[in-house]
Amino acid sequence: MFTISDTIHIDAPLERCFLLSTNIELVALSLHMKPLEGKTTGCVVAGDKLLWAGWKFGFPQMHETLITRYEPPHFFQDTMGRGRFKRFQHDHRLYSVDGRTVLNDKLRFTLPLGFLGRLVGKHILVPYISRTLRRRLVLLKKIAESEDWRHFLPDEDTAKHSSH
């Protein structure tokens, strides 16, 4: 099993960061995939299912995401239902420290194909997923710390209040 973890500190309220983390449009921007079925707009909640489609490494990809745990505003987990991985799980943990939000994302995955899967995981997917995760966290930080968050959360009163 491969594990990838990354953390970012965000100068924005915890609730805003949590909601942005669950926002489907923002996830689509960072993954370069499109939600096709299930919940395709807004923010995910417990029990939601989404089918994502896109191209990765020159191949069409389908990835079904299930929201398997949802504990706002501190934690949610998405787990692959169907897709190219043997197993894929992504934990999103958020907490507040000194008026800032700390967001830690941890992904765990395994691939089919035994030894070949482990080689592909180590040399191709771990670096690729690490870069994608870092890009997602930096984008989330940029949006949360600016007025851009209003585009993704136009109706969220709780997201409007600063923790400073």
Tell what function each PLM region has.
Residues 1-45, 161-164:
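Hydrophobic ligand-binding cavity/cleft-lining segments
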Residues 11-15, 68-73, 93-102:
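A short, structured loop/turn motif at beta-sheet edges
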Residues 3-5, 60-64, 87-90:
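Short, surface-exposed coil-to-beta transition loops
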Residues 79-131, 151:
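Beta-strand/loop substructures that line and gate deep hydrophobic ligand-binding cavities in soluble
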Residues 28, 38-83, 102, 135-150, ...:
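Glycine-rich portal/gate segments that line the openings of hydrophobic small-molecule binding cavities
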Residues 10-12, 56, 109-113:
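Beta-strand elements of well-folded, non-transmembrane domains
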